[in-house]
């Protein structure tokens, strides 16, 4: 082993002067004193700001108003707006699915650990609508679901079967009093 080290050392020592100058040895970190620095004092008028819009913003109340799905902060969608959302879902190549649930949000009733029936999993209405090309087909099924279960929340989800993920979800029907 020692002889092989000596051979490799000898090979390195025979290099020409041009090759030895190509790699500069590490000399440590340079101080920042060599770089010109312009110091600017903090001026609050130059900082990015929302301007007067901050006064217009409201905070969502933490109690009394439940947050549901993607568009839950908006007023309830009209029939035309629901159709536009479903058209968007179909244009992106997602599969529309209709689901319903009695409570409509995550809850735990009988135990502290998460379970199957704790509001994270909704019941699917019929089958996913593979091959659906028109929003009126989906809205017709939403109407049937809300007539069959008038005390349940209904939602539409857009499922991407290529990536195996749910891409969009929004409420289509809330029962009276919610």
From Swiss-Prot:
One of its GO terms (cellular component) is chloroplast. InterPro entries: RuBisCO_ssu, RuBisCO_ssu_dom, RuBisCO_ssu_N, RuBisCO_ssu_sf. The gene is RBCS. Its main location: plastid. RuBisCO catalyzes two reactions: the carboxylation of D-ribulose 1,5-bisphosphate, the primary event in carbon dioxide fixation, as well as the oxidative fragmentation of the pentose substrate. Both reactions occur simultaneously and in competition at the same active site. Although the small subunit is not catalytic it is essential for maximal activity. Residues 1-55 form a transit peptide. Belongs to the RuBisCO small chain family. The keyword Transit peptide applies. GO terms for biological process: photorespiration; reductive pentose-phosphate cycle. Keywords: Calvin cycle, Carbon dioxide fixation, Chloroplast, Photorespiration, Photosynthesis, Plastid, Transit peptide. Heterohexadecamer of 8 large and 8 small subunits. The keyword rRNA-binding does not apply. Disulfide bonds: none annotated. This is Ribulose bisphosphate carboxylase small subunit, chloroplastic. The basic functional RuBisCO is composed of a large chain homodimer in a 'head-to-tail' conformation. In form I RuBisCO this homodimer is arranged in a barrel-like tetramer with the small subunits forming a tetrameric 'cap' on each end of the 'barrel'. One of its GO terms (molecular function) is ribulose-bisphosphate carboxylase activity. It is found in: Plastid, Chloroplast. It comes from the Eukaryota.
């Amino acid at each position: 082993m020692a002889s092989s080290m000596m051979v490799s050392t000898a090979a390195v020592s025979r290099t020409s002067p041009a090759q030895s100058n190509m790699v500069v040895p590490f000399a440590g970190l340079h101080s920042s004193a060599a770089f010109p620095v312009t110091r600017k004092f903090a001026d609050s008028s130059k900082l990015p700001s929302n301007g007067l819009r901050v006064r217009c913003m409201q905070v969502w109340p933490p109690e009394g108003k439940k947050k549901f799905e993607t568009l839950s902060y908006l007023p309830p969608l009209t029939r035309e707006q629901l159709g536009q959302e479903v058209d968007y879902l179909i244009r992106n190549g997602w599969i529309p699915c209709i689901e319903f649930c009695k409570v409509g949000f995550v809850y735990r009733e009988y135990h502290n650990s998460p379970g199957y029936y704790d509001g994270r999993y909704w019941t699917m209405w019929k089958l996913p609508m593979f091959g659906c090309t028109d929003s009126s087909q989906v809205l017709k099924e939403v109407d049937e679901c809300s007539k069959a279960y008038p005390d349940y929340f209904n939602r539409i989800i857009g499922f991407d079967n290529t990536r195996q993920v749910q891409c969009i979800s929004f409420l289509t029907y809330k029962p009276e009093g919610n």
